[in-house]
Amino acid sequence: MNYEQAMEYIHAVQWAGHKPGLTRTRTLLAALGDPHKQLRFVHVAGTNGKGSTAAMMASCLQAAGYRVGLYTSPFINRFNERIQINGVQIPDEELVKLVEQVKPAADAMEDVPTEFEIITALGMLYFAQQKCEIVVLEVGLGGTLDSTNVIDAPECAVITALGMDHVKELGPTLADIAAAKAGIIKEGCPVVSYGGVPEADIVIRRVCAEKHAELTEVDFSRLKYEGGSLDAVEFDFDGLTDVHLPLIGSYQPRNAALAITALRVMRTHGWNIPESAIRTGLETVSWPGRFELLRHAPAFLLDGSHNAHGMRATVQSLKDRFPGQKFVFLVSIMADKDVDQMLSLLAPLAVRFVTVTAHTPRAMPAEVLAEHIRAYGCRAEAADSIEAGVARAVELGGEGPVCALGTLYFSGDVRNAFAELVKG
């Protein structure tokens, strides 16, 4: 088997679909010797900020001297990004070996696993074989029935900012969504929650009480944040002063405060994480595709916000970093998202929109999205391809800023198309 064949196997149509439940993952992992039972975890659930928070925690734990696995989704440029150790993506040849190990077990299952369940098994196997001391594990969707939730009590369960998303799968209210995320809380494990949403906080507090889990809610009154530049945001949090965070979204200091709080809780439970490692980890973290500046002047930004809750944070960041400026937006949005709410947030900042169709069946067709946008009185045109869309947005932007956003699923293609365009 080569890398292309391994990828074909992982993405094969027979695994397609979303089927909640843990039985298949347990069956698959049992056939592989239960690698997850050899590992210790930080488990991260939430609506927005999961990936950024997970990346920050992994970076800090690595700076503290630990061998750290990081499991995230989706990827931006290459699949291998989803499974990393100490900031290094899984090598192609290792991935091929793992697929060869997982394939017989998956093929033998009557209730076929989903693609995400197969990837979870690959990650667990790799982290165990490579003897990771701690794995930062990002939930795929929800919590309770997500395949990552096969693990026993984590070293820390982290719940990031909550908002309305995936309501079809998780339920129509914030309380429903909080209940799904709170599914990662296990008996007696420390829990750190972003908080700030009363109807969700009630649910998380109740579950913690039921599970005898010690809950810490982030004290954002201790976060001092004066703004930032296009290179870094600077903040103080609870005694850690003048941190220069290279993730420049205005929402990132709050994610960092969550990560810091969780790391300090872990320290009280025996993990050796000095403040100096937290600072180093935060100041060297890399997390592409989240309010990422691909070019300074004229500015070209790439952002992964893909629901109204995330879009609100991105719009605030655009106002903070580019006061008084209007944007050409390059947009693709999944058809199952709150499209109108997202567009209503963007419209006041827009000079013009260029729409494209991301390479996923869930994407709203570019022309349909353009029609939606025109309903807001904005000028919008659909491009035939992501490459054409990037070129057109840059042309329309002229000397002004361009921002590509609406889904993480086109981030890699946008980044590559922009690099080609600039290269000429």
Language model features with spans:
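Nucleotide phosphate-binding/pyrophosphate-handling subdomain across enzymes
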Residues: 37-38, 134-137, 145-158, 162-163, ...
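Acidic, Mg2+-coordinating active-site environments of NTP-dependent enzymes
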Residues: 110-111, 118, 131-138, 154-242, ...
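C-terminal helical cap/extension that packs against the catalytic core
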Residues: 194-216, 230-231, 299-302, 308, ...
